[in-house]
């Protein structure tokens, strides 16, 4: 007998199952009861519930439905192989192995018919066939009977050809044509003829809410119900047949006895039969439910046709809150069309203190988690009967939230700490998986600085060569200092530019080993090897570990680079695992799953006798497509709140259910590239899989499963918290449904739009972009913030005698080193953070200095310019310097290196000539003067030209930092000595002259910049590159005044914005982390402030300098 139980309460299902077990005990008490569930989470919940309710949970065997059916089929099909001939990978390898199919696929992808592409197509076609075997067995049957599927000839012709080739290939190999679809069909036929072996069937089976269930599975269960009792528990939001189904449909199923074939014909037919009419009527006659439970309704229709008996497990919901009233309305199908006055008269008042259902709108993921944490603390503090394990948090895409969950929940104070467990692991984030992929991908990578640095982040590799965490920074320093790029000399043999070995590992090792014996002095080298002797004994030992790691990786790179037979890959993969992982690591659940998938891929190909050699890259790609995530059901109900990915715990009751990330893209948007050939898409039927419709149904069931509180959060796009926009459709439906049956203010009760505003203001909460924004403290919040820092800030606001923003204490007058003053004015904002606040922000990107094989980077170029100029000035041998840079690897050891060196000499020679023209005898002078209110300025002025003035040069283009540095030195010179011009020279024939100043004027300016230093150490001075470029464009250097022309002003503004925003080649100033702390959004007010600051500090410089060119 097939007994259908309908309810929404999962605990009622388990109670009903045990009522049967207790009232009808099995003859053999040792026989196990069979429970069929969807997932491990449901299995664990049932075990815990039984153990709590009946004190013991034993003698129960849990199955997934497909595995249960497969076990029964094996008992009745002696020829059924343990490994299916029509599994996903078996079909894929058959497609790859059959020459006719390869030729056909080559025509389909004529634009790109590489072997890699054909491999991907075979995998996609295999996925399609798996769908057909499950949801379109009639198509498979027609193909095998050599008949066409109506209206799909062009789309299905080549698929039919491939399928028939697979069937022929299988027959030729003397293997039975036993795919799952055929096995189900044949077994159902046998049961109809009473030829089915039922001796090993269980006496009864209990099936708990298997959704979605395909018609073929349902008919099979109906068929075996002749031999054993089938108890099917179906969780549904509406279980009253008289409300769900039309009178004609109820009469039809009561008067008609429908065979299995008739059932299938009703499903397969596209004519408007009773099922399709019923679905259409349901969608027409409902408003709310038709949006949410269409998929469930289709399932209910079919189950109602095959069941022998229906038991409705009724229950009552206490109606004490908005959530409970809403649940009751939905369960009683209160959206069936009624007269407006009937709805209005039955509206229910929502109390202002009712927080049982609320919706929270946030701008960012981290803000969502902050709001989640605060709301949970608020509820838990107010409800002592709610334990941590009574809380369930669901997300459709938990991966994106996990970093923020760990950050927010783990950083809470001990008083506000909430223990949590995440019932989900994305396999692709598992360390074992990432390490395996890195190792398998060795043939496709070059072991340069970037890659080696990345590999040092993999704990498994570090453990292999005994590198600890403290040694990693040292290794990174070693890698950058030694400038080693490539792993061996063989790579260079195919280099068309030339044979540069200065940065390969072997040459690098020679430098380091030589450095242990010979010192690197005065740019000397030995046999074209420059010794590297900056290693201490500790560094040298650590570097030896790195050598061991690189040697091991090179060994495996060589092994994995060559294509191999599948049997060889099977052995090689086992050796790879044993070489890098311990037995314990290989036995972890995640590792076992990955190893199992790899083995399945390899062994399926070996079973199909694939005899060609194959690269490991193709196997790696298939492995990446095969693994997804693993659930961690052992962490469920362990005294912590549970974070759950997707709706795996739907229908399991929790006191608090919180749904995060409920945006319009809640359903999966991933589309297979072969969707255009998918016959399910071309001719959809009832009961076809549809993520979007199914997720709507699961969302509604989740709402109905919450006992006390149901919260939703989503993201909005707008940064304006006052503007409510982008409300997801699902949330909008819930709000409007509540408006239809509930009200806040009696005066707006009968006006839908006014009532809608009242409802929104009560249940819909729109949060600010940041937790610390002023609005959070000035307004009375329904959901207080428990973050310790935020509370301290709020306390400051609430106390009127304290200021919310405090100024830093003033710096007392003190002795200042002149170099400190210059350092400040080179970058006032950064110096404020470094010196005043002691804050260092990371401004470097994840790039390495020496990653290019043949070209020199800017820093090395500057160092080389500076050293070459020094050699010129001291009349030293520049050829030796050239050879040194080639041997050390700064300059490529090829023709490009010669070109770079000639370019450098051409750049520096004019600079040297100009210096020698101006330079006389250069002197240095120490000073210590009182400049302002007992503030002593001390230091040393260098390179004072005997002919008068300062002489400064820079072996690169002159920048603002060079100009302001020389300007401050010039002010000091004019304050101390006679009036003379000072000169600053740069490359590209640049020369800047600083005009001589009166002693009084120079002191005035110097005091002004010293005062600016003190002010800037209390409140940052907005002296930015954008402002500097703006003032250079707006200042008329010839006439020493600012342009007033509108076009000039507009052009200067464009230059300002270009510098601020940057482009594809130059990073914008807005990306500077220090400036980001000062200017979050660039407003007109900020721009004017930058203009004003730039004018104040740079105008004196522009008025007292001149630009010229030297020859």
From Swiss-Prot:
One of its GO terms (cellular component) is exodeoxyribonuclease V complex. Disulfide bonds: none annotated. Keywords: ATP-binding, DNA damage, DNA repair, DNA-binding, Exonuclease, Helicase, Hydrolase, Nuclease, Nucleotide-binding. The keyword Hydrolase applies. In the RecBCD complex, RecB has a slow 3'-5' helicase, an exonuclease activity and loads RecA onto ssDNA, RecD has a fast 5'-3' helicase activity, while RecC stimulates the ATPase and processivity of the RecB helicase and contributes to recognition of the Chi site. A helicase/nuclease that prepares dsDNA breaks (DSB) for recombinational DNA repair. Binds to DSBs and unwinds DNA via a highly rapid and processive ATP-dependent bidirectional helicase activity. Unwinds dsDNA until it encounters a Chi (crossover hotspot instigator) sequence from the 3' direction. Cuts ssDNA a few nucleotides 3' to the Chi site. The properties and activities of the enzyme are changed at Chi. The Chi-altered holoenzyme produces a long 3'-ssDNA overhang and facilitates RecA-binding to the ssDNA for homologous DNA recombination and repair. This is RecBCD enzyme subunit RecC. It comes from Buchnera aphidicola subsp. Baizongia pistaciae (strain Bp).
């Amino acid at each position: 007998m097939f007994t259908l139980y309908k309810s929404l309460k999962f605990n009622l299902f388990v109670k009903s199952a045990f009522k049967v077990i207790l009232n009808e005990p099995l003859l053999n008490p040792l026989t196990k009861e069979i429970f069929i569930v969807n997932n491990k989470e449901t299995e664990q919940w049932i075990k815990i519930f039984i153990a709590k309710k009946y004190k013991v949970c034993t003698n129960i065997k849990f199955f997934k439905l497909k595995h249960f059916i497969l076990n029964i089929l094996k008992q009745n099909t002696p020829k059924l192989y343990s490994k299916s001939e029509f599994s996903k990978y078996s079909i894929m390898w058959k497609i790859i192995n059959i020459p006719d199919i390869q030729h056909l696929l080559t025509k389909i992808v004529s634009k790109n018919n590489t072997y890699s592409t054909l491999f991907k197509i075979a995998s996609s076609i295999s996925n399609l066939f798996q769908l057909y075997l499950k949801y379109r067995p009639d198509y498979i049957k027609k193909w095998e009977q050599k008949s066409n599927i109506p209206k799909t000839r062009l789309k299905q012709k080549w698929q039919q050809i491939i399928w028939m080739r697979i069937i022929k290939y299988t027959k030729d190999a003397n293997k039975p044509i036993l795919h799952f679809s055929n096995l189900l069909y044949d077994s159902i036929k046998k049961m109809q003829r009473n030829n089915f072996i039922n001796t090993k069937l269980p006496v009864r089976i209990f099936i708990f809410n298997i959704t979605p269930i395909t018609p073929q599975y349902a008919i099979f269960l109906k068929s075996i119900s002749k031999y054993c009792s089938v108890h099917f528990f179906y969780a549904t939001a509406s279980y009253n047949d008289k409300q769900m189904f039309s009178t004609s449909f109820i009469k039809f199923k009561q008067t008609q006895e429908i065979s299995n074939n008739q059932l299938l014909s009703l499903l397969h037919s596209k004519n408007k039969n009773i099922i399709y009419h019923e679905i259409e009527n349901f969608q027409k006659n409902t408003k709310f439910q038709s949006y949410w439970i269409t998929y469930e309704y289709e399932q209910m229709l079919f189950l109602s046709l095959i069941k022998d008996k229906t038991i409705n497990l009724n229950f009552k919901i206490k109606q004490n809150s908005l959530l409970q009233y809403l649940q009751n309305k939905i369960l009683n199908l209160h959206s069936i069309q009624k007269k407006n006055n009937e709805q209005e008269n039955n509206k229910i008042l929502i109390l202002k203190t009712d927080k049982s259902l609320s919706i929270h709108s946030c701008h960012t993921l981290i803000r969502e988690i902050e709001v989640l944490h605060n709301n949970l603390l608020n509820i838990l503090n107010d409800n002592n009967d709610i334990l941590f394990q009574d809380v369930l948090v669901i997300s459709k895409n938990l991966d994106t939230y996990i970093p923020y969950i760990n950050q927010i929940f783990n950083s809470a104070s001990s008083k506000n700490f909430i223990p949590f467990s995440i019932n989900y692991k994305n396999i692709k984030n598992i360390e074992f998986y990432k390490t395996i992929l890195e190792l398998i991908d060795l043939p496709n990578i070059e072991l340069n600085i970037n890659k080696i640095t990345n590999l040092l982040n993999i704990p498994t590799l570090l453990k292999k060569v005994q590198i600890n965490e403290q040694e990693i920074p040292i290794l990174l320093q070693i890698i950058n200092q030694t400038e080693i790029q490539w792993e061996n000399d063989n790579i260079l043999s195919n280099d068309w530019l030339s044979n540069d070995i200065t940065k390969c590992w072997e040459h690098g090792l020679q430098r380091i080993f030589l450095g242990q014996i010979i010192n690197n002095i005065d740019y000397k080298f030995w046999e074209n090897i420059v010794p590297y002797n900056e290693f201490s004994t500790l560094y040298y030992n650590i570097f030896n570990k790195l050598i061991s790691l690189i040697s091991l990786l090179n060994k495996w790179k060589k092994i994995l680079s060559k294509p191999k037979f599948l049997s060889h890959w099977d052995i090689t993969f086992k050796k790879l695992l044993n070489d890098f992982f311990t037995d314990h690591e290989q036995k972890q659940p995640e590792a076992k799953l990955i190893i199992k998938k790899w083995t399945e891929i390899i062994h399926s190909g070996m079973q199909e006798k694939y005899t060609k050699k194959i690269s490991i890259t193709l196997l790696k790609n298939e492995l990446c497509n095969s693994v997804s995530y693993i659930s961690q059901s052992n962490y469920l109900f362990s005294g912590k709140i549970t974070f759950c990915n997707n709706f795996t715990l739907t229908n399991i009751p929790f006191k608090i259910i919180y749904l995060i990330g409920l945006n319009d893209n809640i359903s999966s948007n991933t589309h297979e590239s072969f969707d255009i050939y998918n016959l399910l898409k071309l001719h959809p039927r009832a009961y076809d899989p549809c993520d979007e419709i199914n997720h709507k149904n699961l969302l509604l069931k989740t709402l109905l499963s919450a006992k006390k509180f149901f919260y939703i959060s989503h993201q909005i796009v707008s940064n304006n918290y006052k503007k409510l926009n982008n409300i997801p459709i699902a949330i909008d439906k819930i709000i409007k449904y509540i408006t239809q049956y509930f009200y806040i203010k009696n005066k707006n009760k009968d006006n839908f739009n006014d009532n809608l505003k009242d409802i929104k203001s009560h249940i819909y909460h729109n949060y600010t972009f940041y937790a610390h924004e002023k609005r959070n403290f000035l307004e009375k919040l329904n959901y207080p913030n428990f973050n310790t820092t935020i509370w301290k800030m709020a306390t400051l606001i609430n106390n009127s005698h304290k200021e919310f923003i405090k100024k830093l204490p003033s710096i007392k007058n003190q002795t200042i080193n002149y170099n400190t003053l210059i350092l400040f004015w080179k970058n006032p904002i950064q110096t404020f953070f470094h010196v005043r606040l002691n804050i260092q922000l990371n401004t470097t990107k994840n790039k390495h200095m020496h990653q290019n094989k043949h070209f020199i980077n800017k820093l090395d170029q500057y160092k080389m310019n500076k050293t070459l100029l020094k050699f010129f000035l001291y009349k030293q041998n520049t050829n030796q310097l050239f050879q040194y840079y080639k041997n050390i690897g700064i300059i490529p050891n090829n023709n490009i290196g010669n070109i770079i060196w000639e370019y450098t000499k051409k750049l520096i020679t004019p600079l040297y000539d100009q210096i020698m023209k101006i330079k006389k005898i250069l002197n240095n002078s120490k000073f210590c003067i009182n400049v302002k209110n007992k503030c002593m300025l001390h230091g040393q002025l260098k390179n004072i030209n005997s002919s008068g003035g300062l002489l400064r040069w820079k072996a690169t283009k002159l920048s603002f930092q060079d100009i302001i540095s020389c300007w401050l030195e010039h002010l000091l010179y004019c304050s101390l000595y006679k009036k003379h011009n000072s000169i600053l020279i740069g490359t590209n024939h640049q020369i800047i002259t600083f005009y001589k100043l009166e002693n009084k004027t120079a002191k005035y300016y110097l005091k002004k910049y010293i005062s600016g230093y003190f002010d800037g150490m209390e409140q940052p001075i907005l002296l930015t590159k954008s402002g500097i470029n703006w003032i250079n464009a707006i200042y008329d250097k010839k006439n020493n005044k600012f342009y007033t022309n509108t076009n000039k002003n507009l052009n200067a503004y464009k230059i300002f914005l270009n510098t601020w925003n940057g482009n594809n080649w130059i990073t914008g100033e807005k990306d500077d982390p220090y400036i980001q702390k000062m200017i979050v959004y660039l407003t007109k007010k900020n721009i004017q402030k930058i203009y004003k600051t730039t004018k104040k500090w740079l105008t004196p410089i522009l008025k007292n300098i001149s630009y010229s060119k030297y020859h």
